[in-house]
């Protein structure tokens, strides 16, 4: 791992001139990019699902505010992540075009933006819904920033496994915003996202391993190799499928969800099997330019959209 990268300071003394320059020179698109909008879609979607399936319902305006707070919090955490990871983002092809490495936004501007949005999202959630939802929202930000970004990401190949908890909070927060408590169903939804995260990100890391290695990030393919990563993708997918059926088995969801979870789960297993059986050279490197891994990565996103959509549909019918 590059000593230069690891020694790069993530806590530089604020430069007022740079901060002013970033505030004046950056476009709205640059500030939006700091929020990682591609990630926000799934966060908002799963948070809304948790809110919609919660018993009792919620005032539409308060519900919209709760989802907005979840989106703001996720975006804020993403901005702080980009601030802290600006050194490795600069050397990875996939992230080199982000606003901080390109100089469109200063590190201090990004940090101030992320902290302000974090505080605003938690305060607004508290005022609009309840203290539990606000506390869970704050915990999700803290987990992503301090546990995943600052502690795990550069230290262990299990960064995605443990850090996946940060992305699993939204349906729990949505449920808590509507009810003021946490039940068994949102806990199961948390677990589904938690076990979905490793095969999703490890599929990505299989075809982006050179980037991670260059940046010194110990993703599983970099540390354990391609073969071990392919096996891990399959293993977590096999754990995910029976777990995803528990809401139906425990009578927390109906047949629409149960049938959807089974079909989608079998499809996910098939995509993971293709990753496992991808043609490789003697070092486990794909001979197909990681086509199965790319397909599995794309399907994993569709999987989460569809299974949570089935849950909401089941609740409505």
UniProtKB/Swiss-Prot annotation:
Pathway in which this enzyme or protein is active: Porphyrin-containing compound metabolism; heme O biosynthesis; heme O from protoheme: step 1/1
Location of this chain's protein in the cell: Cell inner membrane
Pfam families associated with the record: UbiA (PF01040)
GO MF, one example: protoheme IX farnesyltransferase activity
Other notes: Carbon 2 of the heme B porphyrin ring is defined according to the Fischer nomenclature.
Described purpose of this protein according to its UniProt entry: Converts heme B (protoheme IX) to heme O by substitution of the vinyl group on carbon 2 of heme B porphyrin ring with a hydroxyethyl farnesyl side group.
Protein name: Protoheme IX farnesyltransferase
Organism for this UniProt entry: Acidiphilium cryptum (strain JF-5)
Name of the gene this protein is made from: ctaB
